[in-house]
């Protein structure tokens, strides 16, 4: 059944991509690859879809120049992309400098550096989508973090699977499914220390809160994900209705 599980996880994501129309045939996709489990898994899935959907894939790796392992991470990503014949663009960005200059935390500076690099690459290659490896656990953490920090219904929908040209094909799988898949496939990854977003609060939620919620119900993470889906559908509907009523009430001059 291990083989079946592996196929299942892949198919789950492929179905999700189809159902949510995240990728069209012939798309050029930029994918951020840190070398961590999540982005390696997403890279393998896009690579699986490459022929059938006639995709062009370009990987982007950001060397944050913070950790000693940064060079190893970069080499790992370059080697993996080499094996898959996927071009890989490397950005060396001094995140500490940015943080100092822009007066932001290292996490924020790292995120800014990543999205800037994605946008640049997208423009350069005239690509269609940027694929990010956020999964269900990230979604649950974001939701809980926003709820605790204070949010309204529009903020509670957390991350969308499609945000303009940004896509998140892994929002249908949990972290443990990703790790299980990679282990069974014999695929290595690097431990990703750059994931310490808003370090303290996020880590508390990841390491303390979610495990406790899973003690109450082991499907807690999926259930939060479903709630986020519902909220997104409701807010999208509301926004459309409000715009329609507004247009009905206003006359062209």
Where would I find each of the regions flagged by the language model?
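Core alpha/beta nucleotide-donor-binding catalytic domains of modification enzymes
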Residues: 6-33, 37-210
């Amino acid at each position: 059944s291990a083989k079946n599980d592996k196929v299942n996880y892949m198919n789950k994501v492929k179905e999700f991509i189809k159902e949510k129309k995240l990728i069209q045939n012939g798309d050029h996709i930029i994918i951020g690859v840190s070398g961590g489990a999540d982005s390696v898994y997403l890279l393998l899935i896009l690579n699986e879809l490459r022929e059938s959907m006639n995709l062009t894939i370009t990987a982007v790796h950001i060397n944050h120049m913070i950790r000693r392992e940064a060079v190893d991470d970069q080499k790992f990503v370059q080697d993996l992309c080499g094996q898959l014949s996927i071009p890989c663009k490397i950005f060396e960005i001094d995140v500490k400098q940015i943080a100092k200059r822009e007066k932001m935390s290292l996490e924020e500076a790292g995120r800014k550096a990543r999205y800037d690099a994605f946008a640049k690459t997208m423009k350069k290659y005239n690509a269609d989508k940027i694929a990010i490896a956020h999964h269900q656990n990230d979604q649950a953490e974001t939701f809980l973090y926003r709820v605790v920090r204070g949010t309204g219904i529009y903020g509670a929908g957390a991350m969308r699977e499609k945000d303009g040209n940004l896509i998140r094909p892994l929002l249908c799988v949990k972290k443990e499914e990703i790790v299980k898949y990679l282990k069974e496939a014999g695929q290595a990854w690097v431990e990703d220390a750059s994931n310490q977003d808003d370090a303290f609060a996020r880590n508390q939620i990841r390491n303390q809160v979610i495990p406790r919620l899973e003690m109450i119900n082991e499907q807690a993470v999926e259930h939060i994900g479903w709630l986020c889906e519902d909220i997104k559908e409701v807010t999208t509907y509301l926004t459309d209705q409000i715009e329609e009523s507004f247009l009905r009430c206003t006359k062209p001059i």
